[in-house]
């Protein structure tokens, strides 16, 4: 927890799929962290009469990956199989769903605690969870921790989840009522989130219920009625993404990428790469879920993208030639470009989103460069 590599691991895990009128893509990268502690779930078509429902979630583990991995495999079952979710006969009501989600979180947390104790060595890992449960009529946003989800509707951020931070007044009050404190914006000066699954060292205050502990496993659940005409896409991501991109920035960037490609894996990869180049030092995971009215590929946008790439290619050549003797390093090239007013850069991503294009041209013109120097310089680009 908190340890970093000498250079980032940039290999990605990808997946994509479609069904129920939805398309999704996902990407995850270990980045600078010593371990990959993120996990994710993507299920289109749920069992037990919920074939028209879908579930997606991102889990950001800390102090180990055990809780995140267990949740990605079992949280959905705990949600849909409890009696609060099922309710009476027929499709579950909105309140059934919201109550069932909450019950599912509390049940899986208690189940993991009992399992950990039986192994005679309490697991100290924990995980945030952000997800969406999508029915034909509603989208249920689920959040526990500081990962975040947002809905882009009619080209704007319509909704986003609130991060559960110890400095939040309501969270701080609960922490203090449980005998804890908030120091340097952390629970007891240590944990940066005030709600999470796992983290059982923070859930052992006698006389307090599970939602009254220093760290609570209770999710916030918001139901949003779907709008076939206006709903465009949903983004779920861990804080490795949000640390360097704001809600509107990421919404604008994703929308611009959807206008030049319909490959959702590629869009997610561009998000992850861009955040790495913007300075994210954490694991990074993102899921993009597109509704039928998501932005479509535009011939005009594709043309502008090609023109931008050609412009950058020419500028890299000019910068290298201007150097004269010897070839400037990639950091110098990036800093030079960053000082210029380059037209038509992707909104939200800006020059960082074009790092791969620039580096490809640089490598072609400088085939004898030292791969161990420039390729790892993502933390000092300009």
Swiss-Prot record:
Its cofactor is Mg(2+); Mn(2+). One of its GO terms (molecular function) is calmodulin-dependent protein phosphatase activity. Residues 23-291 form the PPM-type phosphatase domain. The modification Phosphoserine is found at residues 375, 377. It catalyses: O-phospho-L-seryl-[protein] + H2O = L-seryl-[protein] + phosphate; O-phospho-L-threonyl-[protein] + H2O = L-threonyl-[protein] + phosphate. It is a lipid-anchor. Binds 2 magnesium or manganese ions per subunit. It is an enzyme of class 3 (hydrolase). A lipid is attached at residue 2 (N-myristoyl glycine). SUPFAM superfamilies: PP2C-like (SSF81606), Protein serine/threonine phosphatase 2C, C-terminal domain (SSF81601). SMART domains: PP2Cc (SM00332). Its main location: nucleus. Mn(2+) 1 binds at residues 60-61. InterPro entries: PP2C (IPR015655), PP2C_BS (IPR000222), PP2C_C (IPR012911), PP2C_C_sf (IPR036580), PPM-type-like_dom_sf (IPR036457), PPM-type_phosphatase-like_dom (IPR001932). It comes from the Eukaryota. Its EC number is 3.1.3.16. GO terms for cellular component: cytosol; membrane; neuron projection; nucleus. GO terms for biological process: cellular response to transforming growth factor beta stimulus; N-terminal protein myristoylation; negative regulation of BMP signaling pathway; negative regulation of canonical NF-kappaB signal transduction; negative regulation of non-canonical NF-kappaB signal transduction; negative regulation of transforming growth factor beta receptor signaling pathway; positive regulation of canonical Wnt signaling pathway; positive regulation of DNA-templated transcription. Mn(2+) 2 binds at residues 60, 239, 282. Keywords: Cytoplasm, Hydrolase, Lipoprotein, Magnesium, Manganese, Membrane, Metal-binding, Myristate, Nucleus, Phosphoprotein, Protein phosphatase. Gene3D superfamilies: Phosphatase 2C, C-terminal domain suprefamily, PPM-type phosphatase domain. N-myristoylation is essential for the recognition of its substrates for dephosphorylation. Belongs to the PP2C family. Monomer. Interacts with SMAD2; the interaction dephosphorylates SMAD2 in its C-terminal SXS motif resulting in disruption of the SMAD2/SMAD4 complex, SMAD2 nuclear export and termination of the TGF-beta-mediated signaling. Interacts with SMAD2; the interaction dephosphorylates SMAD2 in its C-terminal SXS motif resulting in disruption of the SMAD2/SMAD4 complex, SMAD2 nuclear export and termination of the TGF-beta-mediated signaling. Interacts with the phosphorylated form of IKBKB/IKKB. Enzyme with a broad specificity. Negatively regulates TGF-beta signaling through dephosphorylating SMAD2 and SMAD3, resulting in their dissociation from SMAD4, nuclear export of the SMADs and termination of the TGF-beta-mediated signaling. Dephosphorylates PRKAA1 and PRKAA2. Plays an important role in the termination of TNF-alpha-mediated NF-kappa-B activation through dephosphorylating and inactivating IKBKB/IKKB. This is Protein phosphatase 1A.
